[in-house]
Swiss-Prot record:
Positions of transmembrane segments: none
Record-linked InterPro entries: Ribosomal_bL33, Ribosomal_bL33_CS, Ribosomal_bL33_sf, Ribosomal_zn-bd
GO molecular function, one term: structural constituent of ribosome
Family: Belongs to the bacterial ribosomal protein bL33 family.
A Pfam family assignment: Ribosomal_L33
Protein name: Large ribosomal subunit protein bL33A
Annotated source species: Bacillus licheniformis (strain ATCC 14580 / DSM 13 / JCM 2505 / CCUG 7422 / NBRC 12200 / NCIMB 9375 / NCTC 10341 / NRRL NRS-1264 / Gibson 46)
GO CC entries: cytoplasm; ribonucleoprotein complex; ribosome
Highest taxon of the lineage: Bacteria
Lineage, highest ranks first: Bacteria, Bacillati, Bacillota, Bacilli, Bacillales
Keyword annotations from UniProtKB, A to Z: Ribonucleoprotein, Ribosomal protein
GO annotation (BP), single: translation
Length: 49
């Protein structure tokens, strides 16, 4: 079963994206490079709780 998670920008903390995460990968937190409108650049986005 997949779980819905929110991704937040590492620089400004803005929660820009939501994605689905499989239950098999629940142990480690997602870290994805995405575009942030607030920072106006591509930054690392981390999974929030």
């Amino acid at each position: 079963m997949k779980k819905k998670v929110t991704l937040a920008c590492k620089n400004c903390g803005n929660r820009n994206y939501t994605t689905m995460k499989s239950s098999a990968a629940l142990a480690e937190r997602l870290e994805v490079k995405k575009y942030c409108n607030n920072c106006n650049s591509h930054t690392v986005h981390l999974e929030t709780k």
